[in-house]
Structure formats: C-alpha cells, structure tokens
Amino acid sequence: MVIARGLLRSNASSSSSQAINLLKYVTSTGSLQGHTQNLCDASTRHFSSVPSPQYNSTEENGFKGHGMLAPFTAGWQSTDVHPLVIERSEGSYVYDIDGKKYLDSLAGLWCTALGGSEPRLVKAATEQLHKLPFYHSFWNRTTKPSLDLAKELLSMFTAREMGKVFFTNSGSEANDSQVKLVWYYNNALGRPDKKKFIARSKSYHGSTLISASLSGLPALHQKFDLPAPFVLHTDCPHYWRFHLPGETEEEFATRLANNLEELILKEGPETIAAFIAEPVMGAGGVIPPPKTYFEKVQAIVKKYDILFIADEVITAFGRLGTMFGSDMYNIKPDLVSMAKALSSAYVPIGAIMVSPEISDVIHSQSNKLGSFAHGFTYSGHPVACAVAIEALKIYQERNIPDHVKQISPRFQEGVKAFAGSPIVGEIRGVGLILGTEFADNKSPNDPFPAEWGVGAIFGAECQKRGMLVRVAGDNIMMSPPLIMTPDEVEELVSIYGDALKATEERVAELKSKKNN
C-alpha cells in the first residue's frame, strides 16, 4: 500500500483530495514495488505537509506508530505510514536504511554546507568531547572554544563592524533572542514604547513563539494563537507574483519601500523597534530581492531610527557566493542571526552578532541591573563551538564562496533552462539556492488545482530517481551542499529535467480528464 501525504491547505478536504490523487498517480506509475512506501517529506522552515516517495522498509514491522511527535508532520502520517529513515551520509548524498542513495538537493534543511562526511568536523567534535564535553558561559565563566568562535565571527563579518556575539542553539532561538535584545536596548535608552517588529509576508524566522510570530507564513500561526500582537508584516518582495502591469523591478521596490514607510507612520515610528529580513527569502519559496530593494528599505528604517536585523540563518557562509548574504546586497545590519551552516549542521548551534552601539548599551544596562539576565544552558557549548571553528576554517581555507561562484552558474542556468516548461511559472535563485514555482499559463494568477498536487508529483518523481527536494505546495526548493562537484550539478540538472518531463505528462493527463 502506498499512502500520500496531502499538502497543508486552507481546508482538510483539499489536503485529502490531493493525497488521494497523488496516491493514484504514484500507484499508476508502477515505480513503487514490494513493501509499503510513502510520500511524506517533512517541510521545515515552511509549513505544508509535502509528499515525496519513500522507501521499502526491510524492517518487519517498520516504524509506523513511532514515539516521536514529529515536526511539521500530520499525525496520521506517524500512525499510518513509515517515515523515510536516513541512516548515513557521504558528501552530497544520503542513504536510507535500505541502502538507497539520494542526492540531497536541500543539504538536509539548508544546512549541511560541507556535506555529510567531513572528517575534520568529526575530529573537532571528538577531540573536544574527550577534552571538555561541556561547560557553561554564565557568571563570567566560559570555555576557550566559545571565546575563539566569537572572535572569529567578528573578524569574518565585513559588511560592517560588529561588537559582540551571543550564542544560541538554533536560528529560531537566535531570532527569538533578537527581540529580547532589542527590547532591552530600547528600554535602556528610555524608549519603552519601541516594542513593535516589522517582518515580511512569506518570511521564515523560526518556530518558537516569537520567531514564529515574526515569520510571515500563516500555517505557523494557525491554532497557536499567533502572531504576537507586537509583530507587523509588510509586503513580500516577490516581483513575479506581486508586481503591477508594466512595473519594473526598481519601481516595484520603490512601491514596497513606500508601503513600508506608510506602515511605520501609521503605527508611529516611536513604537517600531526593528525590521527583520532574510537577504534571500528561503522557506517562503526562495525569493531574491528585486533590484534596489534593500537600498530603499535601509534608508527608510534608518530615517525612523529603526534597527535592521539580517536573518542570515540560510544565507551565511557562502550560500550566495559571498561569505554572507549581507555582502551581496550591501546590507549594513545592526544585528545578525546565523545558524545552520555555522557548524555545517554537525552540531546544533546558532549565534547573534550585535553592533558596537548596541553592545555598549547592553554592557551599560547590565552594570546597572547587576547582570545581563539572558542565556541558555548550552549557549556557547564547547563541542558545538569547536566544530563551528573548524567549519569556518574550512570555508576560508577552501574558499567555499569562490567555489560556489564557480559551480553556481551551471546550477542556475541548467535548471532555469527548463523555465519554458508549460507547467513552470517561474524559476528563481542566486548562488546555490533555487526555487521553482509551478503555475498554469505562466501566470501567478493561475495556480493548478490544489488537489492535483503538482509540486508533490514532481517531488515524488525526483525521489524515485534518487534526489530529495523540498516541496511546499507547488513550490520546489533546492539548496544543495556547497561542496557539490560539477558532476553532481549535472546529475541534479538531469534528474530535475526527467522529473519535470514526467510531471508535465501527468499534468496533461489531469487536464484531459478535467476537460472531458
């Protein structure tokens, strides 16, 4: 039996219909043989349940009904179908428990930048575990790895001078902590009314209470009583989807900047604390900014004394062909969030960098109050920091951003060569991050029927051919390891093309049935 997981839509019937249709499709292809297979690729840093074909379990009883409350997964999936269980990784590939090999085109969850088998990172973790497996950073006690990592991060970030680094365990925690730091800063300056944060529609900043509130994806808010009332959302800078007829990219950027200013004036500049943005929006569909967008937005927030937070959780450490996304788009942030590639995801760690102006105020305020009363048990965990230090060395020694510049043109051009497909609305990206959006008639206003599950069909076809992609509705996202070889890029492009052709054929069948 094959069970497909439906996409999270506005109502349950849509999801059920889509799952049933996809189930019929995959069964009809004859590609899934033998034991139970399923279609369930968890969608993290985005919020739809995404089908993709999975494995023939060699386990007699499989893993149905396992004990995890699985993130971004519908309850029935855990009960009724087997998860895809990944057992090992090697370079740009992962292997399931049956030994099937997959090209990991999303680098886990945008994070295994150095691939799955970098011995230097394993060695760094092992040596630190033997030497000092844990010590905290409270009360002016800390460890050498945490001090060394903070120093290295401050020297690596060159978009502007930064003052201090605060360590977290994830990007969600980093963005959550940003809100506390900004409030602490403004309270210290006697500006207690500066509490509101402006984020963008379709943004993703995490899944904690505050970071999910900052995120502009409705599925993160539903039934969680979110977003928090101090969070506002402004326009998503997706030119293809939202530009007006005849409007150029620069005109579009100007309109969005004007809308942002109108929102600030409506709420009162004295109430707005910060604006947060990803240099390239990730889980919202891989959306690079339109020309001059960040130039205009930075001018607006600076005009009204509003802090700029750069969420570099996905874009830091070479993803775009620059060490940080801020370098590519000339962003001069007051605060920066990072995680994921910071340790190539080998050990959980995140970090915040704050400007000297902010760190000086925090320093002064903590002296008045007796301490800076924020932190986590694992802030600056020595093993995580040791691995991150080694990862940063590799990024610099191997000049990973330059490697990305060398291979990304073929990655981008190879996939974008399929933009003429009748089922593709847009293919967009920069560096080693890319998104495909399926649409009828090349129009953002003509989505395919949700129950067809076009994105899910494509994901299933990719996985059948040995490649894992991220599916979110009719959006496909890829963000492969930064160490990809030219041959692996060719493999990715080839599988993409074959999967697209099969998806086109299936869509043609669905259209024919609809018209008959």
From Swiss-Prot:
PROSITE patterns: AA_TRANSFER_CLASS_3. Expressed in roots, stems and panicles. Substrate binds at Y204, K340. It holds the Pfam family Aminotran_3. Keywords: Aminotransferase, Mitochondrion, Pyridoxal phosphate, Transferase, Transit peptide. Pyridoxal 5'-phosphate binds at G171, S172, D311. Transaminase that degrades gamma-amino butyric acid (GABA) and uses pyruvate as amino-group acceptor, but not 2-oxoglutarate. Not involved in the interaction with blast fungus. This is Gamma-aminobutyrate transaminase 1, mitochondrial. The lineage of its organism: Eukaryota, Viridiplantae, Streptophyta, Embryophyta, Tracheophyta. The gene is OSL2.
